[in-house]
């Protein structure tokens, strides 16, 4: 019983770290990756569709992305979605492709993005701690109901604390890497 609770908690913690990785990937650094377009949704035949499903991306320069829609009729919709997104870029359309030139990140904008990254990391840490709290409550309930002994309960809590520390450390490492990416010019 306790092992099942620990396994479920670790799976949820792993998911929290995965969400943090995705959040960090969507924060722009000095070099552009297609991941910055991850949250951009295009109104495609009435359905919000991620731009990454509608187009290919080519990065000829560190600050330029060329978007080539698979369906040429969606060119205008893709351009509009990119323009309306919070990426801070003005796409140009030449009839077959869309060019997006990203401005150089100012020092202030870099600091703002570091704050955003720290906020995302803290959200992940809180999520991991909440998972720990729920798992600890479940372990306490198992011990209280007599389904496991107190020694087994303490061992389970110790394992849970180790897992919590391990996953929080992963989030901290992801944050450290993202901060160094953002602050390197």
UniProtKB/Swiss-Prot annotation:
InterPro entries: Ribosome_recyc_fac (IPR002661), Ribosome_recyc_fac_dom (IPR023584), RRF_sf (IPR036191). The keyword Protein biosynthesis applies. The keyword Thylakoid does not apply. GO terms for cellular component: cytoplasm. CDD domains: RRF. Signal peptide: none annotated. It comes from the Bacteria. One of its GO terms (molecular function) is ribosomal large subunit binding. Pfam families: RRF. Keywords: Cytoplasm, Protein biosynthesis. Belongs to the RRF family. Responsible for the release of ribosomes from messenger RNA at the termination of protein biosynthesis. May increase the efficiency of translation by recycling ribosomes from one round of translation to another. This is Ribosome-recycling factor. It comes from Parafrankia sp. (strain EAN1pec). The gene is frr.
């Amino acid at each position: 019983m306790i092992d099942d609770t620990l396994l479920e908690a670790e799976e949820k913690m792993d998911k929290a770290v995965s969400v943090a990785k995705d959040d960090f990937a969507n924060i722009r650094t000095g070099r552009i990756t297609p991941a910055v377009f991850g949250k951009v949704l295009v109104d495609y035949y009435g359905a919000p569709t991620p731009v990454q499903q509608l187009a290919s991306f080519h990065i000829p320069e560190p600050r330029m992305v060329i978007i080539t829609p698979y369906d040429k009729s969606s060119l205008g919709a893709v351009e509009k979605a990119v323009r309306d997104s919070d990426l801070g870029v003005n796409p140009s359309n030449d009839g077959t492709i869309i060019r997006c030139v990203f401005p150089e990140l100012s020092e202030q904008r870099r600091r703002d993005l570091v704050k955003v990254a720290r906020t995302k990391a803290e959200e992940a840490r809180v999520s991991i701690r909440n998972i720990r709290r729920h798992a600890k409550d479940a372990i306490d309930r198992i011990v209280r109901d007599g389904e496991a002994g107190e020694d087994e309960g303490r061992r389970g809590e110790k394992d849970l604390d180790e897992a919590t520390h391990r996953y929080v450390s992963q989030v901290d490492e992801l944050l450290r890497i993202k901060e160094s990416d953002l602050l390197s010019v």
